[in-house]
């Protein structure tokens, strides 16, 4: 899980330009990290590429925090 979190953090830092220290498992993409809906869509696409998986639109709408995306990736490897 630590490796997954580190890879997710790197993508978030690259995409959103936020300080890595703000990225915690509890951090909300929109409220805590300042992402808008387009940012979230782009994050999902990058995560799909990075982890070689497909996140359905329905699932993507439910993923609102860093911890949720890490859990999703871990359970779909």
Swiss-Prot record:
Give residues where O-(pantetheine 4'-phosphoryl)serine occurs: 37
Does the keyword Zinc feature in the UniProt annotation? no
- Signal peptide from the UniProt entry: none
Q: Which residues form the Carrier domain?
A: 2-77
GO MF annotations in UniProt: acyl binding; acyl carrier activity
| GO term, biological process aspect, one | lipid A biosynthetic process
Q: Name one GO cellular component term.
A: cytosol
Pathway, per Swiss-Prot/TrEMBL? Answer: Lipid metabolism; fatty acid biosynthesis
Q: Which UniProt keywords apply?
A: Cytoplasm, Fatty acid biosynthesis, Fatty acid metabolism, Lipid biosynthesis, Lipid metabolism, Phosphopantetheine, Phosphoprotein
- Keyword Ion transport assigned to the entry: answer is no
Q: Which InterPro entries match?
A: ACP, ACP-like_sf, PP-bd_ACP, Ppantetheine_attach_site
Task: Tell me, in one coarse class, where this protein mainly resides.
Answer: cytoplasm
Q: How is it modified after translation?
A: 4'-phosphopantetheine is transferred from CoA to a specific serine of apo-ACP by AcpS. This modification is essential for activity because fatty acids are bound in thioester linkage to the sulfhydryl of the prosthetic group.
Where is this chain's protein located in or outside the cell?
Answer: Cytoplasm
* HAMAP family, A to Z: Acyl_carrier
Q: What does this protein do?
A: Carrier of the growing fatty acid chain in fatty acid biosynthesis.
According to its UniProt record, which protein family does this protein belong to? Belongs to the acyl carrier protein (ACP) family.
Q: What is this protein called?
A: Acyl carrier protein
Gene name, Swiss-Prot/TrEMBL: acpP
């Amino acid at each position: 899980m630590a490796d997954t979190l580190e890879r997710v953090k790197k993508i978030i830092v690259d995409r959103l330009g936020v300080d890595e220290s703000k990225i915690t498992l509890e951090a909300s993409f929109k409220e805590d990290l300042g992402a808008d809906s387009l940012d979230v869509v782009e994050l999902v696409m990058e995560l799909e590429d990075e982890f070689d998986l497909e996140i359905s639109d329905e699932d993507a709408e439910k993923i609102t925090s860093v911890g949720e995306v890490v859990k999703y990736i871990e359970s779909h490897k």
